């Protein structure tokens, strides 16, 4: 299959890029080619451009291309998805929007979160923007059969990111350093609340099952692990892995 990843060299998407290539797909990656943590994987075809800056340039890059699937890893606002609708309507078989599990109801009325849980987060604009994006894409699906699939990742980690709430995005190993020095660390709540972590390569396998799947069109999915841990357990597992 011929696949376009918009982004494609981030924490989650890099694992998906590697798996797509290993599975024999023809993978195009559209980005600015600036990532140092996750460079362009061998075998991928680079379309160099800034998806948020120059739509005319993007249209020329994509003018003669037809993709089986497009996955936009870096659409955050309704303006982003409006652009994607303009660029790809009638030219693709499937459009995958990467949303977020943070879009689910906050505070939740029930501890078990499913795809049917209402989308409502008054505490974080990022999440509200993702909800608006989802609603716009589903409207386009119902009105014009735009072939959208929505995916809601939860807390995903990989080689460059420690899966701990409170870890700095810029300096993710700061919490590990405190553990190694015997310093106190901040654990969410009283440590007993439950959470699910997802290794980025596991997410990639979940995505692979949805790409090219006609039954996924017009649907939303969350891709997470099936292992439920308390935050105390998560921090303890991290501490024990350090061998200190």
Locate the predicted segments by residue.
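Mid/C-terminal beta-alpha module of Rossmann-like enzyme folds, strongest
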Residues: 209-244
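Conserved beta-loop-beta element that borders a ligand/cofactor-binding pocket
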Residues: 136-165
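Active-site YXXXK catalytic motif of short-chain dehydrogenase/reductase
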Residues: 126-130
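Active-site "gating" loop of Rossmann-like NAD(P)-dependent oxidoreductase/epimerase domains
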Residues: 100-125, 139-143, 167
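Glycine-rich "substrate-gating" loop/helix at the edge of Rossmann-like oxidoreductase active sites
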Residues: 158-169, 189-201, 225-227
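NAD(P)H-binding glycine-rich loop region in Rossmannoid oxidoreductase-like domains
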Residues: 9, 34-91, 97, 103-105, ...
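N-terminal Rossmann NAD(P)H-binding glycine-rich loop of SDR-like oxidoreductase domains
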Residues: 3-23
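A conserved pocket-lining segment of Rossmann-fold NAD(P)-dependent short-chain dehydrogenase/reductase
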Residues: 174-198
């Amino acid at each position: 299959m011929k696949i376009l990843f918009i982004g494609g060299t981030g924490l989650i998407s890099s694992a998906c890029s590697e798996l797509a290539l290993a599975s024999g797909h023809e993978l195009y990656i559209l980005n600015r080619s600036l990532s140092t943590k996750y460079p362009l994987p061998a075998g991928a075809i680079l379309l160099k451009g800034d998806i948020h800056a120059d739509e005319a340039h993007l249209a020329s890059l994509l003018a003669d291309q037809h993709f089986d699937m497009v996955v936009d890893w870096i659409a955050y606002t309704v303006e982003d998805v409006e652009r994607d609708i303009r660029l790809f309507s009638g030219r693709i078989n499937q459009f995958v929007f990467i949303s977020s599990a943070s879009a689910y109801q906050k505070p939740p009325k029930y501890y078990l979160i499913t795809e049917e849980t209402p989308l409502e987060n008054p505490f974080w604009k990022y999440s509200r923007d993702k909800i608006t994006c989802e609603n716009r894409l589903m409207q386009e699906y119902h009105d014009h059969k735009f072939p959208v699939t929505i995916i809601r990742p939860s807390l995903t980690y990989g080689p460059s990111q420690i899966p701990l709430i409170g870890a700095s995005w810029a300096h993710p190993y700061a919490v590990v350093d405190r553990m190694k020095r015997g310093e106190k660390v901040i654990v969410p709540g009283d440590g007993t609340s439950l959470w699910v972590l997802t290794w980025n390569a596991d997410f990639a396998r979940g995505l692979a099952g949805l790409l090219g799947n006609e039954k996924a069109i017009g649907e939303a999915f969350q891709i997470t692990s099936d292992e439920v841990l308390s935050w105390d357990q998560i921090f303890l597992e991290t501490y024990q892995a350090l061998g200190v």
